[in-house]
Swiss-Prot record:
Biological process terms in GO annotation: tRNA N2-guanine methylation
UniProt gene name: TRMT1L
Compositionally biased intervals (Acidic residues): 1-18
UniProt-listed SMART domains: ZnF_C2H2
Cellular component per GO, a single term: nucleus
The protein's name: tRNA (guanine(27)-N(2))-dimethyltransferase
Keywords, ordered alphabetically: Isopeptide bond, Metal-binding, Methyltransferase, Nucleus, Phosphoprotein, RNA-binding, S-adenosyl-L-methionine, Transferase, tRNA processing, tRNA-binding, Ubl conjugation, Zinc, Zinc-finger
Positions of C2H2-type zinc fingers: 184-206
Protein's job: Specifically dimethylates a single guanine residue at position 27 of tRNA(Tyr) using S-adenosyl-L-methionine as donor of the methyl groups. Dimethylation at position 27 of tRNA(Tyr) is required for efficient translation of tyrosine codons. Also required to maintain 3-(3-amino-3-carboxypropyl)uridine (acp3U) in the D-loop of several cytoplasmic tRNAs.
Organism this protein belongs to: Homo sapiens (Human)
Reaction catalysis annotation: guanosine(27) in tRNA(Tyr) + 2 S-adenosyl-L-methionine = N(2)-dimethylguanosine(27) in tRNA(Tyr) + 2 S-adenosyl-L-homocysteine + 2 H(+)
C-alpha cells in the first residue's frame, strides 16, 4: 500500500496541451486498478453540479504543461513543474482553485480542497502539512516555499516536498525511483536537486555553459544568441560565457584592451619601416586583434589569424564577414569571394584564417610580426616563433601566468622559466625581466639576438616586445645580458652579479648595503637568471606615441608617455623631444612628435633577404641614436621606505629633490608610487628624511628640517634602515 501511495503521488505527464486550455482533473486511482483516462471531449462535456464539491484531482500531478521560457520558440513548448512560478500570487492561486476552474499550468495535491474552507498546500503532502485556513496557508507558502526559492530569469524555483521522481540518472544510466525529501526542480533541465546551495551551483553551471532555456525538454531549441561587442571600430561576436576561458572556446577579455592597443601601435610603427608586413595572430579566439590590424592598417599588412579550435575558427570567419573583411584560404577562393561581394559593399581587406597548431604554422611559414598570447605561459612557443621570423622582425609575447611570474607560485616559475624568484617590492619588473630572459634564450638557440623595444607588466598580463637581430654575433651579445641578481632580504637592496666564471670569495661585498656585517646569518639570496639590460627603446616608443595620436587611441597615450619618461629616466616636467635636421616635427594635442625620414622601405631588403654590411652598419648607427643611456634597473617604493613618525613629501616634489641632488630619476609604470633612480638606497632614504616633516609638528616648515646637521640625518637614516631590516627579518624568519 505504501508503494501504491507513492505511485499515486508521482507526476503524470500529458503531451501537447495548449496554454489556455481548461481541464477537469481525473479522479484518483484506487487500489483495484487504474482506469484509462477519458478523452478530452468527454471531460469537457461531463457536467459538474454547482453544489457538489469538485472531484479530487490526481495526487501530485506535478509536472503539468506550460509555455517554455520567453527565449524559447513558440513551437518548442517545455514542461514546467508547479513549484516554478513567477510571483507569490501565482503560487497562492494553486491552492484556491474551485469548481473545475483549473489552470492547465498547475497541478494540485489531492488535499487542496478539504471540508469547509480549508485548503491544503499544493507542494506538501498531507502528512507534512494538513489542510488549514487561507491565512495560515498563505503564511506557509510565503515562509516555507517562497523565501527559500532560487531565482532565475524572472522565475522562482520554490522548494517542493512532494515525493517526485528523480530525473537525474545514476552512474549506470538508469533513473532511480526513491522517496525524496525537500528538493528543487531545475527550470532548465528538470533535474531534482535536494539542497539549495547545490541548486545555486547547478544553475550557475548552466549559465557558464550558455544554457539559458530548457534544451533538455524542448524538442527543438535555438542556440543562445551571440552578443556583439565593439572595440576600436571593430565588431566581434562573442558567446554568452565569453569571459570564462575554461567554459568557452572564444575567450574575450575586455580588460586586455590596453594590451591590444599597445600591440596595434607596435605594428603600426613597424609598418612605417617596410610594407607589406606578414603578420600572425597565433591564438585568435574571437579574432579581435587581427581584425583591428586589417581594418585600420589596410594593405600595409597581410594578416593571418590562427586557432586550433574549430568553433573559434568558425567564429573568426563570421567576425570577418561582420566587419566586411574577406576570408582568404587560397587564390581561387579569393576570386570567388570577390564575386560574391554585394553591390555597394566595400571590401576593407583580406584575412587568412587557419586551423593549425601554432608551433606547426610558425615552422611552415615565415612572418615579419608574430604575436603570442596563449592561455598561460608562452615558453612552449618561443622556439617556433624565432625559427622562421624574418630579420628585423618583431615578436610580441603576452604572458598571463601572473601567479608564477609575480612569485605567488615560485615552483611553477622554476619549472617554466628555470629561474629562482621571491616576492620583492619590484616584483613586476622582475617578472618582465624573467620573460625577456626566456625570450633571449630561445632566440639565441636559433642564432638570433634580440633588442627589447618595451616591456609592460600590469595587473593582468606581462607584455614583452622585441626586435629580432639575425646572426650568431647578435646571439652571443644577447646571451651575455642574462645575469643573476643579488638581493638583500633585510633592506631589499639589489645589484646584478658581476661577469666572470670565477667563484667569488665574498659575494656580499657587491651589495652597497652593510646588512651582512650588522645582521646575523645569511642576508642575501640569488635571483634569476634575469635580463640585465634595458627594457625600453626610446625612439621606438616615440613612434608608437605618434601612431596612438594618429589613430585616436587615447587610452594608452598616458601609458606610452610614462614609458618614454622611464626609458630616458627623466621627470615628466623635463620631457621634451628635440628635432634634428632630418626629422619632421609634428604637433598633435599639444605634444611634439618626431618622425624620421630614413625609416623607409629603402632601408630594408625584401622579405627574408639578408642586409648588406653597409646597411647593417647604418642600422646599428640608427639604433644607437634612438637609444639613450640605459635606464637604471629596478625602482624603490617611496611608501615602503618611508620614515616612521615623519610625513614624507609629495612624490612629484621628491623627484625634483633627487634630481637636484644629481641623480637620474623618473616614475615607473610598474608601481604608481615607485621611483626609478640610480641613487643607492642609503642616499635615497637620506634625501627622503631630509625633506620629510615630523608628524607631531602639524605641518612644520621644511626649512627647520633642512637645518639639521648631516650627522644627525645619517644617524636617523641608519636607525630607520635597521628598524626596517629588523621588521622585515621578523616577517621572513
Amino acid at each position: 500500500m505504501e508503494n501504491m501511495a507513492e505511485e499515486e503521488l508521482l507526476p503524470l505527464e500529458k503531451e501537447e496541451v495548449e496554454v489556455a486550455q481548461v481541464q477537469v482533473p481525473t479522479p484518483a486511482r484506487d487500489s483495484a486498478g487504474v482506469p484509462a483516462p477519458a478523452p478530452d471531449s468527454a471531460l469537457d462535456s461531463a457536467p459538474t453540479p454547482a453544489s457538489a464539491p469538485a472531484p479530487a484531482p490526481a495526487l501530485a500531478q506535478a509536472p503539468a504543461l506550460s509555455p517554455s521560457l520567453a527565449s524559447a520558440p513558440e513551437e518548442a513548448k517545455s514542461k514546467r513543474h508547479i513549484s516554478i512560478q513567477r510571483q507569490l500570487a501565482d503560487l497562492e492561486n494553486l491552492a484556491f482553485v474551485t469548481d473545475g476552474n483549473f489552470d492547465s499550468a498547475s497541478s494540485l495535491n489531492s488535499d487542496n480542497l478539504d471540508a469547509g474552507n480549508r485548503q491544503a498546500c499544493p507542494l506538501c503532502p498531507k502528512e507534512k502539512f494538513r489542510a488549514c485556513n487561507s491565512h495560515k496557508l498563505r503564511r506557509h507558502l510565503q515562509n516555507l516555499h517562497w523565501k527559500v526559492s532560487v531565482e532565475f530569469e524572472g522565475y522562482r524555483m520554490c522548494i517542493c516536498h512532494l515525493p517526485c521522481r528523480p530525473v537525474k540518472p545514476n552512474i549506470i544510466g538508469e533513473q532511480i525511483t526513491s522517496k525524496m525529501g525537500a528538493h528543487y526542480h531545475c527550470i532548465i533541465c528538470s533535474a531534482t536537486i535536494t539542497r539549495r546551495t547545490d541548486m545555486l551551483g547547478h544553475v550557475r553551471r548552466h549559465m557558464n555553459k550558455g544554457e539559458t532555456k530548457s534544451s533538455y525538454i524542448a524538442a527543438s531549441t535555438a542556440k543562445p544568441p551571440k552578443e556583439i561587442l565593439k572595440e576600436a571600430d571593430t565588431d566581434v561576436q562573442v558567446c554568452p560565457n565569453y569571459s570564462i576561458p575554461q567554459k568557452t572556446d572564444s575567450y574575450f577579455n575586455p580588460k586586455m584592451k590596453l594590451n591590444r592597443q599597445l600591440i596595434f601601435c607596435t605594428l603600426a610603427a613597424l609598418a612605417e619601416e617596410r610594407k607589406p608586413l606578414e603578420c600572425l595572430d597565433a591564438f585568435g579566439a574571437t579574432g579581435i586583434m587581427g581584425l583591428q590590424w586589417a581594418k585600420h592598417l589596410g594593405n600595409a599588412v597581410k594578416v593571418t589569424i590562427n586557432d586550433l579550435n574549430e568553433n573559434s575558427v568558425t567564429l573568426i570567419q563570421e567576425n570577418c564577414h561582420l566587419n566586411k573583411l574577406k576570408v582568404v584560404v587560397d587564390s581561387k577562393e579569393k576570386e570567388k569571394s570577390d564575386d560574391i561581394l554585394e553591390e555597394g559593399e566595400k571590401n576593407l581587406g583580406n584575412i587568412k584564417v587557419t586551423k593549425m597548431d601554432a608551433n606547426v604554422l610558425m615552422h611552415l611559414r615565415s612572418f615579419d610580426f608574430i604575436h603570442l598570447d596563449p592561455f598561460g605561459t608562452s615558453v612552449n612557443y618561443l622556439d617556433s616563433a624565432f625559427r622562421n621570423i624574418r630579420n628585423l622582425g618583431i615578436v610580441s609575447v603576452t604572458s598571463t601566468d601572473i601567479s608564477s611570474l609575480y612569485a605567488k607560485a615560485q615552483h611553477v616559475a622554476r619549472r617554466h622559466y628555470g629561474c629562482n624568484i621571491v616576492r620583492t617590492e619590484y616584483y613586476k619588473e622582475l617578472a618582465a625581466r624573467i620573460v625577456v630572459a626566456a625570450v633571449a634564450r630561445a632566440a639565441a638557440r636559433c642564432n638570433k639576438g634580440i633588442e627589447v623595444l618595451f616591456a609592460v607588466a600590469l595587473e593582468h598580463f606581462v607584455l614583452v616586445v622585441v626586435r629580432v637581430l639575425r646572426g650568431p654575433t647578435s646571439a652571443d651579445e644577447t646571451a651575455k645580458k642574462i645575469q643573476y641578481l643579488i638581493h638583500c632580504q633585510w633592506c631589499e637592496e639589489r645589484i646584478f652579479q658581476k661577469d666572470g666564471n670565477m667563484v667569488e670569495e665574498n659575494p656580499y661585498r657587491q651589495l652597497p648595503c652593510n646588512c651582512h656585517g650588522s645582521m646575523p646569518g645569511k642576508t642575501a639570496i640569488e635571483l634569476g637568471p634575469l635580463w640585465s639590460s634595458s627594457l625600453f627603446n626610446t625612439g621606438f616608443l616615440k613612434r608608437m606615441l605618434f601612431e596612438s595620436l594618429h589613430h585616436g587611441l587615447d587610452d594608452i597615450q598616458t601609458l606610452i608617455k610614462t614609458l618614454i619618461f622611464e626609458s630616458e629616466c627623466t621627470p615628466q616636467s623635463q620631457f621634451s623631444i628635440h628635432a634634428s635636421s632630418n626629422v619632421n616635427k609634428q604637433e598633435e594635442n599639444g605634444v611634439f612628435i618626431k618622425t624620421t625620414d630614413d625609416t623607409t622601405t629603402d632601408n630594408y631588403i625584401a622579405q627574408g633577404k639578408r642586409k648588406s654590411n653597409e646597411m647593417i652598419t647604418n642600422l646599428g648607427k640608427k639604433q644607437k641614436t634612438d637609444v639613450s643611456t640605459e635606464h637604471p634597473p629596478f625602482y624603490y617604493n617611496i611608501h615602503r621606505h618611508s620614515i616612521k613618525g615623519m610625513n614624507m613629501p609629495k612624490l612629484k616634489k621628491f623627484l625634483c629633490y633627487l634630481s637636484q641632488a644629481g641623480f637620474r630619476v623618473s616614475r615607473t609604470h610598474f608601481d604608481p608610487m615607485g621611483v626609478r633612480t640610480d641613487a643607492p638606497l642609503m642616499q635615497f632614504k637620506s634625501i627622503l628624511l631630509k625633506y620629510s616633516t615630523p608628524t607631531y609638528t602639524g605641518g612644520q616648515s621644511e626649512s627647520h628640517v633642512q637645518s639639521a646637521s648631516e650627522d644627525t640625518v645619517t644617524e636617523r637614516v641608519e636607525m630607520s634602515v635597521n628598524d626596517k631590516a629588523e621588521a622585515s627579518g621578523c616577517r621572513r624568519w
